[in-house]
Structure formats: structure tokens, C-alpha cells
């Protein structure tokens, strides 16, 4: 599973700045689910090929009342969710009682944590370490989050304590063996296609899982996938292997009630990252709400293939159904590539059709195409609709190749690629999607400029070549002097 790292500390010690730098965003709110994650922000981050989920929390002072008290509780909950904690302190302000209170809480919870002395601009790092040594958190790692100083050392120390997932280890092995660093994922012998069932509480996720497993379900084992109780359920259907990742847990038949489910953002985000295909469940009677858009946005950021299931469709009036379909077109335009199914998980209506869309989305996400095929599609697209002119010169796109999968990454080489407008990129994306008949998966397009491979390189001359060059230059100067004298 993708590790979870939480940023905790007093107010104004630089947690949000650190969050923005590690997630490489300005607002850094990737999974800000209002009402469910009050004062906790979730970001999808990576460092030197290692992926992780980052949680930004509100400040803790120890004397909160009212709303501040609730926000502090959310920060302490983030500590419980995390695999590792970055405890930030302000090197300029020095150690405070609030810092000591947080350190004591981390010790009581026996939480893996590292002390980070932020804002060391113009401060001796050794002095900063000595200042916070009485807290008993080990040597503080000095950083300047706003400038990026010390971040490399910090992340190396943190990620060295966290386990790698199988895909990262396989990719590292490929690189070590000199293989091309492009891994095309596929279903494993054991797991098959991994499907994450996600959605807001009470939309019928667990009911759908049990319905899809069927009366005579084939379950090899049910075991917790993480300490946060995500359940991995391998099973077979029509000879195909699958694994459900159920964040709410599967309840036995007869015990499923549409009670309020405990909603864990971390479990949902981890399930998305670990899945091949996401089935996104929505409540047809409530329509599209902002929480749905936030969750879909994270699945899209993660590049996962998506199938949308609109549950509780039975019993709705024709006018209500027409309104919901109009809202889907209006608000879910950014995932218009995903199949939408109108189902009743309780009665089983339309549920069987989900498997066909899961298979199609997965195949679209992981299929490999040769460079010749992708280049031919590019040439046809350019012939039909030329790129715009830039400073009187036409943008030239030369060839394309596959750079990765799940989602498909198409790398296009050419000149002036930095000037390609977003509208033309969308045109190319739609062209590839139409010609390759892709469904259910996002496509990413990356451009490479026509760089001169010899730029900045200079041959080292031998002594003999240096002497020859010197003689030629001397001869040239003498000849030039004679021509001037004749004039």
C-alpha cells in the first residue's frame, strides 16, 4: 500500500509550505473533502520515484477551545492515520511548551516520527539541533521549506524507513538491469484485476460489493490489507480473476443495512492508488455533489481507469432520471471517457454489466502500441489539423511513442513543443482516444523538444591535434597578413 505521511506541529511553523513543496502545487489541496476532513488536507506526492500520500494538519497549541479544539482533534486523528509523522518546529522561535506537548503525544502513541527544524535561514543548523534536543525526539533535520534547502536529506531519511511497494521494486530492478524504465502493469496471477469500490458514505458500496460477488461467491481469503482495515477480496467470475479493495469492509449477507459508514479519506486514497480500475459509486437520488467531484478528481490525478455506477436508480420517476442524466453531462464532463451504469445494488439491476466495462477500461489502460502506430496517428492528426504558428514558424511534431501505461502516456517529439496550446493537446488526446478506441482511462500526453544531442559537448583534443591546430592557425594568420600587405 502507498505509505501515508502526516505533517504536524504548532501553527505557522511552515507545514503548508512544506506540503506545497512536496506535492508540487500552489494550493496543495488534492483531496480536500469539506465536512469530512475538516482542517485536514490530503495530497498525492512523490519523491525520486517513491509515491506517498501527504496529510497537512491544522496547528496544535494545547490550549484550544471551541472550533480550535475540534481542529486540533483532527490533527491528532491525522497522526493516527499516518505511517510516519514529520513533526515541524520553528527554528527561529525555539522550543515552546506546545512543541513539548506534541512530542509527548507522539511518544505516548509510539508513533514513528522525525523532528524537522524549519526556517533555518541565517541560523546555524547545529544551534537549531541543540535547541530542540531536550525534547527527546532525536537530532532534528534542519530545513528551509520556503527555499527547498534540506528537503533532499529529509525525504531520504523518511522514505528509508518506509517499505517499497511491489511496482516500485520492480521498476528499480528494471533500471538496475539496464531495462527501459517503462513498466506496463498487468493483472498478477494471484490478484487479477484490482478493483477499488469508492464513493461517499451510504451510497451503497458494500451492498454493491456483495452483489457483485454473488450468492455463490468464490472468495479465496478475506484479510485486512492495512492497519486501517481495507479489505482485499480475491474472487473469480467467468474464469477471470479479480480482487476487490473495499474500504468499508464486506458485511455478511443479512447484516447489510444502509447505516452511516465510517468514512476514511486515507483508506479511499490508498485504495485508488493500489487499484487497476476504480468503480465510482454515486447515489442517483442525491445527484452529483462536490464530494463526488473531489473523489473523482483524485482518481483522475492518480491516472486510474474509471467506471461510474449510479446506484439506487430503481423507483425514480422519468422526470427525475432525465434531470440526473442532464446533471451528469454538465458536471462530469471531465470524465466523459468513463462508462456510466445506472444500477440497483440492492436488487441487482444492471450490476452484471459493470464487469464488461471494468475489462474494457483495464485493457485500454494497459495495452501497448508500437511507435509506428502512434506516429501514424500523429501524422494523420497533424495532416487534418495543423498546429498553430508561433512567431511566424509552424510547430513541427515528428513522432510519438508509448512512455507508460495505466494511464497511457504518449510521448510526442517535435520543435517548439513548449508553445503547443492546451486546445491542441486536447485535440490530439481525443484523436488518440477515438482511433485507438480507448474507454474508461485518462490519457496523458508529454512533449519532448528537438534538442541537439551534441549541444554543450566538446571533444577533447589529443596533443597531436592541438599542435596541428596551432600550426594551421599560425599559417592562416601569416596568409592573412600577406594579403593585407599586398593591398
From Swiss-Prot:
Domain KH-like: 367-451
Source species, domain of life: Bacteria
Biased composition (Basic residues): 467-487
Residues binding GTP 1, per UniProt: 9-16, 56-60, 118-121
One of the GO biological process terms: ribosome biogenesis
Gene Ontology molecular functions: GTP binding; ribosome binding
Region named Disordered: 448-487
Cysteine pairs bridged by disulfides in the record: none
Entry binding sites for GTP 2: 199-206, 246-250, 311-314
Domain EngA-type G residues, every copy: 3-166, 193-366
Keywords assigned: GTP-binding, Nucleotide-binding, Repeat, Ribosome biogenesis
Gene3D superfamilies in the cross-refs: 3.30.300.20, P-loop containing nucleotide triphosphate hydrolases (3.40.50.300)
Chain intervals with Basic and acidic residues compositional bias: 448-461
Record text on subunit structure and interactions: Associates with the 50S ribosomal subunit.
Family label: Belongs to the TRAFAC class TrmE-Era-EngA-EngB-Septin-like GTPase superfamily. EngA (Der) GTPase family.
Functional note: GTPase that plays an essential role in the late steps of ribosome biogenesis.
Protein's recorded name: GTPase Der
Protein source organism: Pseudomonas putida (strain ATCC 47054 / DSM 6125 / CFBP 8728 / NCIMB 11950 / KT2440)
Amino acid at each position: 500500500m502507498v505509505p501515508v505521511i502526516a505533517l504536524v506541529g504548532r501553527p505557522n511553523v511552515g507545514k503548508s509550505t512544506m506540503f506545497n513543496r512536496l506535492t508540487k502545487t500552489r494550493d496543495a489541496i488534492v483531496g480536500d473533502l469539506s465536512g469530512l476532513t475538516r482542517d485536514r488536507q490530503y495530497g498525492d506526492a512523490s519523491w525520486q520515484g517513491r509515491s506517498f500520500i501527504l496529510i497537512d494538519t491544522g496547528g496544535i497549541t494545547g490550549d484550544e477551545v471551541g472550533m480550535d479544539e475540534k481542529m486540533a482533534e483532527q490533527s491528532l486523528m491525522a497522526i493516527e492515520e499516518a505511517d510516519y509523522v514529520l513533526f515541524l518546529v520553528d527554528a527561529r522561535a525555539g522550543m515552546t511548551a506546545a512543541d513539548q506537548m506534541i512530542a509527548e503525544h507522539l511518544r505516548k502513541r509510539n508513533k514513528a516520527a522525525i523532528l524537522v527544524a524549519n526556517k533555518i535561514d541565517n541560523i546555524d543548523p547545529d544551534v537549531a539541533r541543540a535547541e530542540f534536543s531536550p525534547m527527546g525526539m532525536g537530532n532534528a533535520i534542519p530545513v528551509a521549506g520556503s527555499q527547498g534547502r534540506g528537503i533532499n536529506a529529509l525525504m531520504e531519511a523518511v522514505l528509508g524507513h518506509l517499505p517499497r511497494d511491489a511496482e516500485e521494486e520492480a521498476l528499480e530492478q528494471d533500471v538496475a538491469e539496464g531495462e527501459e524504465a517503462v513498466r506496463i502493469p498487468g493483472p498478477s496471477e494471484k490478484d487479477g484485476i484490482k478493483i477499488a469500490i469508492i464513493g461517499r458514505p451510504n451510497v451503497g458500496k458494500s451492498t454493491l460489493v456483495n452483489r457483485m460477488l454473488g450468492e455463490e461467491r468464490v472468495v479465496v481469503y478475506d484479510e485486512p490489507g492495512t492497519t486501517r482495515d481495507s479489505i482485499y477480496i480475491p474472487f473469480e467470475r467467468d474464469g477471470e480473476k479479480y480482487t476487490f479493495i473495499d474500504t468499508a469492509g464486506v458485511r455478511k449477507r443479512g447484516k447489510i443495512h444502509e447505516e452511516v459508514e465510517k468514512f476514511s479519506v486515507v483508506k479511499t486514497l490508498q485504495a485508488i492508488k493500489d487499484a487497476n480500475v476504480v468503480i465510482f459509486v454515486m447515489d442517483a437520488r442525491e445527484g452529483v455533489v462536490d464530494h463526488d467531484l473531489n473523489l473523482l478528481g483524485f482518481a483522475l490525478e492518480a491516472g486510474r481507469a474509471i467506471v461510474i455506477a449510479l446506484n439506487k436508480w430503481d423507483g425514480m420517476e422519468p422526470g427525475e432520471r432525465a434531470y440526473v442524466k442532464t446533471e451528469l453531462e454538465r458536471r462530469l464532463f471531465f470524465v466523459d471517457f468513463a462508462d456510466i451504469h445506472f444500477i440497483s445494488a440492492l436488487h441487482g439491476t444492471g450490476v452484471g454489466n459493470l464487469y464488461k466495462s471494468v475489462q474494457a477500461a483495464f485493457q485500454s489502460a494497459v495495452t501497448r502500441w508500437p511507435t509506428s502506430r502512434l506516429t501514424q496517428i500523429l501524422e494523420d492528426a497533424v495532416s487534418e489539423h495543423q498546429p498553430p504558428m508561433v512567431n511566424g514558424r509552424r510547430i513541427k511534431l515528428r513522432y510519438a511513442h508509448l512512455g507508460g501505461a495505466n494511464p497511457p502516456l504518449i510521448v510526442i517529439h517535435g520543435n517548439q513543443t513548449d508553445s503547443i496550446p492546451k486546445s491542441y493537446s486536447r485535440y490530439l488526446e481525443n484523436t488518440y482516444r477515438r482511433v485507438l478506441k480507448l474507454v474508461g482511462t485518462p490519457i496523458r500526453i508529454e512533449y519532448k523538444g528537438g534538442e541537439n544531442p551534441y549541444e554543450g559537448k566538446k571533444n577533447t583534443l589529443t596533443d597531436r591535434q592541438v599542435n596541428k591546430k596551432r600550426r594551421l592557425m599560425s599559417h592562416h594568420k601569416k596568409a592573412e597578413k600577406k594579403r593585407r600587405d599586398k593591398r
